[in-house]
Amino acid sequence: MTALWLIVLCGVLSVVYAIWATSSVLSADAGSPRMQEIAAAVREGAQAYLRRQYTTIGIVGIVIFVLLVYFLGFYVAIGFAIGAILSGAAGFIGMNVSVRANVRTAQAATTSLAGGLELAFKAGAITGMLVAGLALLGVTLYFGFLVYSLKLAPDSRVVVDAMVALGFGASLISIFARLGGGIFTKGADVGGDLVGKVEAGIPEDDPRNPATIADNVGDNVGDCAGMAADLFETYAVTAVATMVLAAIFFAKTPILMSMMTLPLAIGGICIITSIIGTFFVKLGPSQSIMGALYKGLIATGVLSLIGIAVVIYTLIGFGKLDGVDYTGMSLFECGVVGLIVTALIIWITEYYTGTDYRPVKSIAAASVTGHGTNVIQGLAISMEATALPAIVIIAGILVTYSLAGLFGIAIATATMLALAGMIVALDAFGPVTDNAGGIAEMAGLPKEVRKSTDALDAVGNTTKAVTKGYAIGSAGLGALVLFAAYNQDLKFFVADSAHHTYFAGVNPDFSLNNPYVVVGLLFGGLLPYLFGAMGMTAVGRAASAIVEEVRRQFREKPGIMQGTDKPDYGKAVDLLTKAAIKEMIIPSLLPVLSPIVVYFLIYAIAGGGATGKSAAFSAVGAMLLGVIVTGLFVAISMTSGGGAWDNAKKYIEDGHYGGKGSDAHKSAVTGDTVGDPYKDTAGPAVNPMIKITNIVALLLLAILAH
């Protein structure tokens, strides 16, 4: 009981930190009336979009809530609601701070680079701490309520199902937020660039471009609210999956409760280390912004190592554990592996997307010979970028499995995600600096201010790319833990078919000789591609609508280009809001319905009865692995490739290969418009898709067992 209260205290601390940081950000100077006017337009657009998005999700959520009450009971449905509401809240609050911090960052940059950095990072840290804190509070308090208030056994089905449903609630918000936000932001970005930069020849964030405000709104709904929901979900889902595994592996042992609280305790201690880490972010004498941010991340990592050692030692000791053949020490070693995997994935992603390294420079060089060669080189880099992260994840799985079996992999993933607070802070720093640059440009601030905001924005682009790499790596491992939970859960029901009569005579066979397993693998493998295609098509459609709208305004109001007429910014925002909401629903339902359809389809094809059930459970399990395997590669290649295309354009804009306006620059803009939906819509949305498929399969087991 004390352990749970201490974990809750850590969660509360993160919320207190967020409140303190918010008041500190809001007390900063908000700049000139012109700057405030632009910021207000961005804020209104972002709030209007989120209201629509949450209303739509709310309708879908209520339907699922009712179904869960019917199939699995009230407490499971409440778990779903908690996950959904908290995930939505983290994104909503974070974004509301971010749209107020942008103008203050632009104003702070007029005095010093350090001031701009401090404000933008603090705004990002608010979202980060809310994500980690609310996810931890949601899981811990509901688990505590079920176990201590309702007096349910920690490994009872109600508790396990309610925890899985909580993860499902977070997942649902996450896939909608990622996809909807991504369609909005990239529709504006691609559409605005095609007409503004390529046709009209005006620079980025030029106030004459009617899509400018929509582009700045998009940064917030995509990168701030979208990323927050994504990592909230991975955090909650991994904690839940680790708890489910603990409930199965340590069912009849005295350490059951300690093992189930272990992932939560690791999360709790890492919130404290993340909060301490934020105070290390200071601009040093070298004036390296990335260096300042990495100082905070490294401090968090080192402190977390010590914290995790303390947590494991106090909860379960370093010695031999009941019921299994590994020690507490080997679980700590798995935690260390989790931190090493995090560091390596971040470093590899930066290598593939940073302007200082070979991949980005090679795309920039290829732009000299034209649009085609830019796209060819960009695609080559996007494929190459999958190799090293995959090898790191493979090594992580092998080492942790040999140390402590499946539970070791789960603890490594839980440790990886325990740093989510700091990582989301780095990510949410991106849209704040991006918007600050836009506001500085539109308000006509002096050149040296633009220089500061550009420097911050360039780093913001790298942090956004780096955190996407982390989000995918952790999602892949998290999904693997969920697959293990599916497999163990299935074994549990089959072994206990006296109580769960549906599973009588079922004998799932995951060997590769089973044709149903091969069918499942292939079916799972196609899902990320199909899902990615839907996302890309949606962006293409939204961008076309924006291109038409911007051209129409330029045609009907020739005064816009002379600066005598004002563009109608609201029209573009409204158009994108409608498009994004409409386009996000069908793709989001794909991973929700797939496991159910595959199960009943294979059940019917294999002739029903116990044989049909065995075939269907095997096919669904294989499908989950198929989704993880191709999903990982699709997501990494899209996010890293897109990031490299984007930064190749920035590299040329910095004066290489002829600089802005050169032929190489025009080719690089083409590459960037391809890379945009790659890295900000389809790629990141594959993350929640992988996990939803796995969670729905777990819930399907629970429903069939009832």
UniProtKB/Swiss-Prot annotation:
UniProt keyword terms in alphabetical order: Calcium, Cell inner membrane, Cell membrane, Hydrogen ion transport, Ion transport, Magnesium, Membrane, Metal-binding, Translocase, Transmembrane, Transmembrane helix, Transport
Binding residues annotated for substrate, in chain numbering: K186, K679
InterPro entries attached to this UniProt entry: PPase-energised_H-pump
One of the record's GO cellular component terms: plasma membrane
Gene Ontology molecular function, alphabetical: diphosphate hydrolysis-driven proton transmembrane transporter activity; inorganic diphosphate phosphatase activity; magnesium ion binding
Function: Proton pump that utilizes the energy of pyrophosphate hydrolysis as the driving force for proton movement across the membrane. Generates a proton motive force.
Full protein name: K(+)-insensitive pyrophosphate-energized proton pump
Organism of provenance: Bradyrhizobium diazoefficiens (strain JCM 10833 / BCRC 13528 / IAM 13628 / NBRC 14792 / USDA 110)
